[in-house]
């Protein structure tokens, strides 16, 4: 005949080691009065069960500081202060005046040199003329002498001079350009000077 089995609640045997105490909170910043002493009960606890040891509750709960971060942040140096560069020094007003005067004088000298070079070039291109004068001088002198009787019976010699002058001027003008073509012009001028009668009177006693 089978025996009836009764099940009773099972209790674990008491351990010989005390449980680990809970972490103690950090001391408060201000001093609080100590808690009243805990008095144990007069009757001993049952041998098979021991209550866990709990610390007395604090009269005022204090906030715990946050735990430190497991990964510390690298320390970054502060950025250097922003320094504005000093403004460039303002040039003296006389400096600009000197530059303008020098540039003006240089431009004037350059223009004068350019004008002189252009003048020389045009002078070379201008026609160069050579002038040759040929003068022909022809003079004819005719002398005629006569003796006449004067009013008082004396003899008078009369000399008649006839002078014939021919002046011929021949001007040859040659104009030569810088180009190969040559121009020549010849001008002939004839000047005839004729004085037909020159009378000289000579008296003879």
Curated annotation (Swiss-Prot):
Q: Where is the composition biased (Pro residues)?
A: 20-88
Q: Where is this region: Disordered?
A: 13-88, 176-205
Any idea which UniProt keywords this protein has? Cell membrane, Cell wall, Cell wall biogenesis/degradation, Developmental protein, Membrane, Secreted, Transmembrane, Transmembrane helix
Quote the disruption phenotype from the UniProt entry.
Answer: Constitutive loss of function results in seedling lethality. In conditional loss of function, aberrant secondary cell wall (SCW) formation of root vessel elements; this phenotype is stronger in double mutant plants lacking both TED6 and TED7.
This entry carries the following GO cellular component terms, namely: extracellular region; plant-type cell wall; plasma membrane
Which residues fall in a compositionally biased region of kind Basic and acidic residues?
189-205
The residue spans the entry assigns to the Cytoplasmic side of the membrane are as follows 118-205
Superkingdom:
Eukaryota
Membrane topology, as annotated: Single-pass membrane protein
Extracellular face residues: 1-96
A Gene Ontology annotation in the biological process aspect, one of them, is: plant-type secondary cell wall biogenesis
Please give the chief subcellular localization of this protein. Answer: membrane
Give TM segment ranges.
97-117
**Tissue expression from the record:** Expressed preferentially in differentiating vessel elements in seedlings.
This chain belongs to the protein called Protein TRACHEARY ELEMENT DIFFERENTIATION-RELATED 7
- Source species, please? Arabidopsis thaliana (Mouse-ear cress)
């Amino acid at each position: 005949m089978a025996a009836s089995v009764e099940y009773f609640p099972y209790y674990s045997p008491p351990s010989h080691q005390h449980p680990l105490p809970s972490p103690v909170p950090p001391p408060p910043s201000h001093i609080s009065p100590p808690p009243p002493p805990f008095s144990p009960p007069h009757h001993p606890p049952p041998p098979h069960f021991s209550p866990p040891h709990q610390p007395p509750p604090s009269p005022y709960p204090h906030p715990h500081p946050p735990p430190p971060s497991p990964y510390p942040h690298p320390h970054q140096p502060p950025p250097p202060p922003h320094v504005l560069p000093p403004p460039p020094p303002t040039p003296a007003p006389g400096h600009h005046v000197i530059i303008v005067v020098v540039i003006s004088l240089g431009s004037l000298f350059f223009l004068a040199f350019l004008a002189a070079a252009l003048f020389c070039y045009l002078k070379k291109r201008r026609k160069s003329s050579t002038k040759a004068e040929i003068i022909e001088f022809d003079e004819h002198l005719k002398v005629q002498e006569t003796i006449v009787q004067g009013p008082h019976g004396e003899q008078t010699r009369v000399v008649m001079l006839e002078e014939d002058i021919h002046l011929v001027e021949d001007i040859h003008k040659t104009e030569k350009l810088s180009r190969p073509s040559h121009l020549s012009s010849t001008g002939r001028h004839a000047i005839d000077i004729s004085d037909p009668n020159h009378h000289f009177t000579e008296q003879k006693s």
